[in-house]
């Protein structure tokens, strides 16, 4: 059993380098999604069934002949299948975890075959509320089934089946993605060799559920929401979605980070420095939040926001075991890496420590890193050398165990 590693300068797993010398760090290149169609009905936790659906995916690297080098990356609330590389449709669209995944990066695509999946209900190509309901010929809208993290895992498992992957070398994710990785380890233990959970939690606190509820109410009470059927009305509940994003964005940053970025800096103050005594933008932080909200409302779907935040609320694997997290995690056979960040108040380090304690109680191999970083919850997306050293070291250990001592020849992957 691996002992927990707290605030490491370098992780113990990085001590012995893999024999092969990887190529220089680089981009995963120009990438485009593939759309997989699944006609087998998918039973959902709600009791409903989704009769056929599509999932948008992207892949990076090459699947080896033994199909043992696959890594599934699960995305957070507003992300997608576009994990790394540059979108073929937009050269400015770089993958949301491009600093983590690619040639020579912590998750080295010279060795690993990485899959990014856009979850059901999302708005980046997979079947969701904006998709056409075959029963009506109109967008699903509010009629789209409510989903859970476990529903996403069942759908993702079919992607693994599509590629003939019996067992992932690792399933990983940050935030909501970490919940999916944890769910994989519990619900499909035989299919996960390693589970990497970053800046996540085994359940939402009352405060977090409260934030989600306020965000949802902002959307639902927008006059342009039309009960979720705004597509038919040619409207977008942009005001509500913008406010929802502003609320969420505050929770992703630490107080210190916001103080350093904005402080009480004024936005175009009067010549004499006086306040304007009105309700338009007065401070830089207000301008920033408005910009983030308005930008988000132009590309994200409001019904998707409702679905995903409710899936967050419902995630609680210990609910089935009377609140005993160790019992809930007992089916897991994977090795675990957990990473938390000191200033993350959305999913604070104590939630990761709680998972570590439960796993150790079960005798599961666990490596834990608690990174002292000022950036709050969003630190999991940033290029922090200490954080990346932990992840790199862990994946190098996996590579040694799997005998991935050299780059996998790019012979093409199954479509």
From Swiss-Prot:
Feature type site, description Important for acyl-CoA specificity: 346
Main location: cytoplasm
Gene3D superfamilies assigned to the protein according to its UniProt record, in alphabetical order: 1.10.1740.110, alpha/beta hydrolase
Residues where substrate binds: 245, 378
GO annotations of cellular component type: cytoplasm
Localization (cell): Cytoplasm
EC number: 2.3.1.46
Every AB hydrolase-1 domain range: 69-383
Presence of the UniProt keyword Cytoplasm in the record: yes
Entries under Pfam families matching the protein: Abhydrolase_1
Active site annotation, chain numbering: 175 (nucleophile), 344, 377
Keywords, ordered alphabetically: Acyltransferase, Amino-acid biosynthesis, Cytoplasm, Methionine biosynthesis, Transferase
Single annotated GO MF: homoserine O-succinyltransferase activity
Complex and partners: Homodimer.
Family designation: Belongs to the AB hydrolase superfamily. MetX family.
Protein name per UniProt: Homoserine O-succinyltransferase
Source organism of this protein record: Bordetella parapertussis (strain 12822 / ATCC BAA-587 / NCTC 13253)
Encoding gene (name): metXS
């Amino acid at each position: 059993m691996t002992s927990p590693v707290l605030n490491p300068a370098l992780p113990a797993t990085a001590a012995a380098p893999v024999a092969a010398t990887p190529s220089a760090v680089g981009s995963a290149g120009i990438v485009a999604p593939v759309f997989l169609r699944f006609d087998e009905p998918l039973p959902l936790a709600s009791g409903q069934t989704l009769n056929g659906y599509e999932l948008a995916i992207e892949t990076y690297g090459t699947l080896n002949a033994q199909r043992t080098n696959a890594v599934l990356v699960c995305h957070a609330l507003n992300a997608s299948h576009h994990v790394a590389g540059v979108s073929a449709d937009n050269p400015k669209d770089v993958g949301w975890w491009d600093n983590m995944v690619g040639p020579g990066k912590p998750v080295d695509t010279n060795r690993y075959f990485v899959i990014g999946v856009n979850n059901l209900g999302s708005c980046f190509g997979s079947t969701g509320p904006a998709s056409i309901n075959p029963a009506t010929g109109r967008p699903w809208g509010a009629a789209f089934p409510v989903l859970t993290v476990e529903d996403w895992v069942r759908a993702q498992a079919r992607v693994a089946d599509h590629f003939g992957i019996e067992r992932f070398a690792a399933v990983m994710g940050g935030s909501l993605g970490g919940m999916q990785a944890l769910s994989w380890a519990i619900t499909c233990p035989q299919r996960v060799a390693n589970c990497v959970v970053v800046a996540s939690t085994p359940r939402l606190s009352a405060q977090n559920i409260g934030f989600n509820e306020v965000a949802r109410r902002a959307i639902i009470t927008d006059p342009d929401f039309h009960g979720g059927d705004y597509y038919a009305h040619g409207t977008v509940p942009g005001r509500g979605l913008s406010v929802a994003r502003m609320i969420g964005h505050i929770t992703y940053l630490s107080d210190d980070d916001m103080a350093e970025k904005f402080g009480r800096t004024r936005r175009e103050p009067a010549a004499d420095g006086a306040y304007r005594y009105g309700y338009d933008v007065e401070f830089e932080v207000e301008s920033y939040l408005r910009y983030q909200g308005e930008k988000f409302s132009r590309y994200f779907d409001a019904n998707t926001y409702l679905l995903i935040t409710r899936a967050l609320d419902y995630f609680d694997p210990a609910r089935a075991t009377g609140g005993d997290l160790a019992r809930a995690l007992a089916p897991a056979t994977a090795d675990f890496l957990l990473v938390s960040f000191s200033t993350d108040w959305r999913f604070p380090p104590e939630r990761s420590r709680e998972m570590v304690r439960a796993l150790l109680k079960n005798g599961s191999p666990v490596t834990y890193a608690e990174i002292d970083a000022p950036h709050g919850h969003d630190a999991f997306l940033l290029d922090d050398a200490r954080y990346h050293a932990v992840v790199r070291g862990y994946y190098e250990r996996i590579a040694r165990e799997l005998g991935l001592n050299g780059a996998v020849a790019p012979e093409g992957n199954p479509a």
